[in-house]
């Protein structure tokens, strides 16, 4: 499903469709796309404190906007998948991570 959505987003970038929200984002450029990613991230955080359906809706919105960002930056979804696979099964300890307050 994510692959299909990503391919459709790339198609819209290459073959714009009038009135398309995806094309609107591409036309406005990287700053607008980043603003939407930030807004949706905040909405995920807020929804996490509310109810699960709201959380699902906001995560779907964030996922879509992240895919638009990847397409804008010409980063393939398969490269993200490969990175996740590379990390699969690796153990990490709290010693390997920065304290959240330090981020």
From Swiss-Prot:
One GO CC annotation: cytoplasm
Statement: the UniProt record of this protein carries the keyword Nucleotide-binding: yes
Pathway where it operates: Amino-acid biosynthesis; L-histidine biosynthesis; L-histidine from 5-phospho-alpha-D-ribose 1-diphosphate: step 2/9
Designated name of the protein: Phosphoribosyl-ATP pyrophosphatase
Originating species: Listeria welshimeri serovar 6b (strain ATCC 35897 / DSM 20650 / CCUG 15529 / CIP 8149 / NCTC 11857 / SLCC 5334 / V8)
Family per similarity comment: Belongs to the PRA-PH family.
Enzyme Commission no: 3.6.1.31
Cell compartment(s), UniProt: Cytoplasm
UniProt-listed PANTHER family: HISTIDINE BIOSYNTHESIS BIFUNCTIONAL PROTEIN, HISTIDINE BIOSYNTHESIS BIFUNCTIONAL PROTEIN HISIE
